[in-house]
């Protein structure tokens, strides 16, 4: 084969092929054909189209389903049975300590006893111990904090236990119960004795908690504090003593958590008043009977804080308390002062904002 002839034929073929490609491209550009798009009528496409066309109805329906589910869960959580674990022989082994004895502590003690706890109440003297014994509940016991020997025996009773672990006593937590009433009282009517009594009771409760810290650490127990959340958030006029006490309790709980590393839970109440409420009497005979629904919410949250896996450090009783405490964080001080001045002029404040039965 002649190499020159072969090279000439190759060049000629390449030129012809390039000319055909150029002619084909020119033909396509001069006479464009419509591009047909094949849409797939799949189930996913139909579902997306339906959701888009009915987005308003779908949104309202989703919101209704969410609210219905939330309402059902709230109702179930409100009525579900809560009981403390017991030993194999059905003996009570879970212990809870109350920092003081007052009508609110009485309500909590009776409820914890009913749920399967052993309740130990820290009292100041024999008269308070006699009051606790009048409850006639074998698992609600008193411990006089001024008797050092009795306190030491109680502290050592958890470490000097023999036998299987299932039968051993376990300290679950200590509940700091607020003292003092939250009645509407102008500050000029508060005498020296009232101030001294309120802060003395508060300091005794703090001292009792401090004394129990080594035992709480060894038992990995929790500290639960109750405070009037609305009062500490707004510090309204004519509620000087309860506002100061509530703020002091919350500050004490935050300090405890940072200093000791214990699990500390603050339950903020909607300013419930149990001081004139007798748990054993009928509701008609009590001067300030609390709402049964709100009372049960408080007791349920105390139980969940004692035995829950991951308790929140701050819990609110009721949506109203949560809403008002949350709003107070964003309101400037001047706005709150103006609102209180307006309420003070028209005497609305004691009825519309704080009172809750």
Curated annotation (Swiss-Prot):
GO terms for cellular component: cytoplasm; mitochondrion. The lineage of its organism: Eukaryota, Fungi, Dikarya, Ascomycota, Taphrinomycotina. The modification Phosphoserine is found at residue 282. The keyword Phosphoprotein applies. The keyword Cytoplasm applies. Keywords: Cytoplasm, Phosphoprotein. Disulfide bonds: none annotated. It is found in: Cytoplasm. This is UPF0744 protein C106.03. Pfam families: DUF1776. GO terms for biological process: steroid metabolic process. Belongs to the UPF0744 family. PANTHER family: 3BETA-HYDROXYSTEROID DEHYDROGENASE DHS-16 (PTHR43313:SF1), SHORT-CHAIN DEHYDROGENASE/REDUCTASE FAMILY 9C (PTHR43313). One of its GO terms (molecular function) is oxidoreductase activity. InterPro entries: DUF1776_fun (IPR013952).
């Amino acid at each position: 084969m002649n190499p020159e002839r072969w090279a000439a034929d190759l060049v000629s073929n390449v030129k012809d092929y390039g000319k055909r490609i150029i002619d084909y491209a020119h033909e396509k550009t001069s006479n464009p054909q419509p591009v047909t798009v094949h849409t797939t009528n799949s189930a996913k496409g139909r579902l997306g189209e339906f959701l888009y066309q009915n987005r308003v109805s779908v949104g309202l329906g989703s919101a209704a389903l969410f609210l219905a589910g939330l309402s059902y869960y709230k109702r179930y959580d409100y009525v579900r049975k809560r009981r403390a674990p017991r030993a194999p022989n059905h003996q009570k082994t879970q212990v809870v300590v109350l920092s003081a004895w007052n009508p609110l502590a009485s309500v909590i003690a009776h409820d914890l006893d009913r749920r399967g706890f052993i309740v130990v109440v820290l009292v100041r003297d024999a008269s308070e111990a006699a009051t606790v014994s009048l409850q006639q509940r074998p698992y609600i016991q008193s411990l006089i904090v001024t008797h050092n020997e009795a306190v030491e025996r109680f502290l050592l009773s958890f470490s000097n236990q023999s036998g299987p672990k299932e039968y051993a006593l376990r300290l679950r937590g200590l509940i700091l119960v607020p003292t003092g009433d939250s009645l509407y009282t102008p500050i000029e009517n508060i005498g020296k004795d009232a101030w001294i009594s309120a802060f003395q009771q508060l300091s005794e409760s703090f001292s009792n908690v401090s004394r129990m810290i080594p035992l709480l650490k060894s038992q990995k127990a929790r500290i639960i504090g109750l405070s009037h959340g609305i009062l500490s958030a707004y510090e309204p006029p004519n509620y000087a003593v309860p506002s100061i006490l509530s703020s002091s309790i919350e500050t004490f709980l935050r300090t405890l958590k940072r200093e000791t590393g214990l699990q500390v839970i603050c339950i903020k109440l909607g300013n419930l008043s149990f001081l004139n409420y007798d748990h054993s009497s009928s509701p008609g005979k009590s001067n300030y009977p609390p709402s049964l629904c709100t009372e049960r919410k408080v007791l349920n949250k105390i139980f969940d804080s004692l035995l829950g896996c991951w308790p929140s450090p701050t819990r609110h009783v009721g949506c109203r308390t949560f809403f008002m405490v949350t709003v107070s964080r964003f309101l400037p001080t001047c706005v709150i002062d103006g609102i209180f001045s307006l309420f003070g002029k028209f005497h609305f404040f004691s009825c519309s904002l704080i009172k809750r039965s």
